[in-house]
Amino acid sequence: MQSLYSIAVLAAAASASLADMDLEFFGTEPAGDYYGSDLPDINVDDFYEKTFDNLVDHYNMQDDRTYKQRYWINDEYFNKGDKKGPIFIYICGEYRCSVPATRLYPFMLGATYGARLLVLEHRFYGDSQPFDDWSLENLAYLSSQQALSDLAYFLGAMKKEHDSEVLVIGGSYPGAMSAWFRERYPHIAIGSWSSSGVVQPIVDFWQFDE
């Protein structure tokens, strides 16, 4: 298998941004032509929606509560043989997630590597709701730290099925998450595709309005 390190380097240099994704954006032009390469389109019908029992609180060993976290999986291109394909996972951010557009470039690239393609919805968004209500007490569990641990717990389960190398992908806030994940969990992810990752967020960013 070709090394995923080369993909991580390519991702860092990629000019196309996945930030603030409209998941249909990349369906407007054939990305294979845009990038000057002959890459396969991804059929959205090959993605299957599932749920995963993730932990509500990853930092309290006495709390065994779980919630249904939504994800999508596409094994159409996955090489399960001796040369196992990698796992390419797109991290959804602060929005209701849906199946990616057919021409999402990282997934098109993943298909050429025989990758399992995954999409994970962020806790507290879409159908991935740990609680029935958004009380202040419950919203205490809405944090990047818990979301990163969600991703680690989820990928741990996926790697038990197939111990594949993992590339995490995201843009804007999920781009930051992909970079943070690679830094925090280098034993899980071999690389990170961070497009416009907000890795140094500022709470009171008053310069933005100037």
PLM feature spans:
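Conserved alpha/beta-hydrolase
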Residues: T112-Q129
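Alpha/beta-hydrolase fold nucleophile elbow
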Residues: H162-S172
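A catalytic-pocket lid/entrance helix-loop region that shapes and gates access to the active site
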Residues: I188-E210
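Alpha/beta-hydrolase active-site loop
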Residues: L139-K159
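Short glycine-enriched nucleophile-adjacent loop
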Residues: Y173-P186, S192, V199
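Glycine-rich "HGGG/HGxG" loop immediately N-terminal to the catalytic nucleophile
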Residues: F124-N138, V203
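Alpha/beta-hydrolase active-site loop signature
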Residues: Y95, R123-G126, V199
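Catalytic-loop region of hydrolases
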Residues: Y5-A8, A13-R116, Y141
